[in-house]
């Protein structure tokens, strides 16, 4: 099975297992590290996840992956929290983390409300309306970024 097909199939199975445990799949990676393939999942829930949550996901998902035989080669399974710089991937994430400091990178330069074009936006997430991510920038301007133009978005740690 091609890598993209493995990722797609594992994502479906992982989302089923993780949601049944009251958590959400934030991100999934399947890549070679050294001589070994690593399947890394990042999970979260309201209030955050702990070691027992990660162990439960690992145990349950391992059983499902073994039965479904999705990955034919040897791999390591890692399950962890997304960390303080959690990626924002879904439309719902941009509403859920409203009020938090975010860093957003876009596929192409976009203007802020002062007309300055940039690809990196850092500021307070104001939410998402009609598919447009709203950010109050650190420099005082505002930005309205179409969701489909977001290449990468992460929460930023505030000191």
Curated annotation (Swiss-Prot):
The keyword Cytoplasm is assigned to this record: yes
A single GO BP: translation
UniProtKB keywords: Cytoplasm, Ribosome biogenesis
Subcellular location: Cytoplasm
SUPFAM superfamilies tied to this protein: YhbC-like, C-terminal domain, YhbC-like, N-terminal domain
Record-level GO cellular component terms: cytosol
InterPro entries noted in UniProt: Ribosome_maturation_RimP, RimP_C, RimP_C_sf, RimP_N, RimP_N_sf
CDD domains xrefs: YlxS_C
Residue ranges of the TM segments: none
Signal peptide boundaries: none
Highest taxon, organism lineage: Bacteria
Family that this chain belongs to: Belongs to the RimP family.
Function (record text): Required for maturation of 30S ribosomal subunits.
Protein's recorded name: Ribosome maturation factor RimP
Organism field: Geotalea uraniireducens (strain Rf4) (Geobacter uraniireducens)
Gene name for this UniProt entry: rimP
């Amino acid at each position: 099975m091609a890598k993209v097909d493995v990722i797609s199939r594992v994502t479906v199975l992982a989302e089923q297992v993780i949601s049944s445990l009251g958590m959400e799949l934030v991100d999934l990676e399947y890549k070679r590290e050294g001589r070994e393939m690593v399947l890394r999942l990042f999970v979260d829930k309201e209030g955050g996840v702990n070691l027992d949550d990660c162990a439960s996901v690992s145990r349950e998902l391992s059983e499902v992956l073994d039965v479904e035989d999705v990955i034919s080669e040897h791999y390591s399974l890692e399950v962890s929290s997304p960390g303080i710089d959690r990626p924002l991937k879904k439309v719902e994430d941009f509403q859920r983390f409203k009020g938090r400091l975010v860093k957003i990178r876009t596929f192409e330069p976009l203007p802020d409300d002062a007309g300055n074009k940039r690809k990196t936006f850092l500021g307070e997430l104001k939410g998402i309306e009609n598919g447009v991510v709203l950010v109050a920038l650190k420099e005082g301007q505002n930005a309205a970024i179409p969701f489909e133009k977001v290449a990468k978005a992460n929460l930023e740690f505030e000191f």
